[in-house]
Amino acid sequence: MIFSKISQVAHYVPQQLVTNNDLANIMDTSHEWIFSRTGIAERHISRDEMTSDLAIQVADQLLTQSGLKADAIDFIIVATISPDATMPSTAAKVQAAIAATSAFAFDMTAACSGFVFALAMADKLIASGAYQNGMVIGAETLSKLVNWQDRATAVLFGDGAGGVLLEASKDKHVLAETLHTDGARCQSLISGETSLSSPYSIGKKAIATIQMDGRAIFDFAIRDVSKSILTLMAQSDITKDDIDYCLLHQANRRILDKIARKIDVPREKFLENMMRYGNTSAASIPILLSEAVQKGQIRLDGTQKILLSGFGGGLTWGSLIVKI
């Protein structure tokens, strides 16, 4: 049988840094108010780079690190809710920029679960035997979706990209997976709505910026995500002691605290970087993974079991247990 493994990781964030104190200069907030509620102190905001620019930086790093030629890449999946345009896909721009002429490329929209969903799909593509090498990238410029007068959401989000190179392997590395969607709760977190605008249509006012029911999302993360992780471990016969690190979507430090208690995994196993990046949606998990590899916490030698878990708009949530 053929399986997939993560062989390389990379991340990139825009240079411009916006601190909580910077935000306090343009809206009614303070560092203390933001940090005590979220664990976020600063975030990177793009000055002139688009989502594709961030993703291309990651793809270039993955190619360089791997030593592969661009035409060895079979597919590129970009998870994003903030593409440059609805057409062409962000992934198509990445494919062109790195000259991966043999690769097919497409975007995936699953909000903050996007990287996990895309990684699960990429694993199946390689397991099919038809493809050998693929890139999965989470990339966002959420700053263009934020209402900068709304302190409830503007303080949360940042821009960035992270990704992995998947290669075919004779050993199984994706050990367990669970993916979920509940569209009945979609109005809890929305952005980028469009309206009908033809001469033959009756349009309604569209909601362009991020709108969030914070309490509903907080409760959803604690309840549904915790339950799905516990079920995943039970069904796969993987215990909390088997897990080396938990890399969850970086939405809010309080959410991580509560999920750690719910699933009874030591809090120190939960890596975090939202203090420096904020919520980067589909990019948060791969950025966290890339940094953990840089720091030597995760070794990429196939000996560690890592829980990856994303949750967000849709509502969507999903988890993978991978051997890295």
UniProtKB/Swiss-Prot annotation:
Enzyme Commission number(s) from the entry: 2.3.1.180
Region (ACP-binding) location: 250-254
Involved pathway(s): Lipid metabolism; fatty acid biosynthesis
One GO term of the biological process aspect: fatty acid biosynthetic process
Keyword Lipid biosynthesis tagged: yes
One Gene Ontology molecular-function label: 3-oxoacyl-[acyl-carrier-protein] synthase activity
Keywords: Acyltransferase, Cytoplasm, Fatty acid biosynthesis, Fatty acid metabolism, Lipid biosynthesis, Lipid metabolism, Multifunctional enzyme, Transferase
Protein family (similarity comment): Belongs to the thiolase-like superfamily. FabH family.
PANTHER family assigned to the protein according to its UniProt record, in alphabetical order: 3-OXOACYL-[ACYL-CARRIER-PROTEIN] SYNTHASE (PTHR43091), BETA-KETOACYL-[ACYL-CARRIER-PROTEIN] SYNTHASE III, CHLOROPLASTIC (PTHR43091:SF1)
Official protein name in the record: Beta-ketoacyl-[acyl-carrier-protein] synthase III
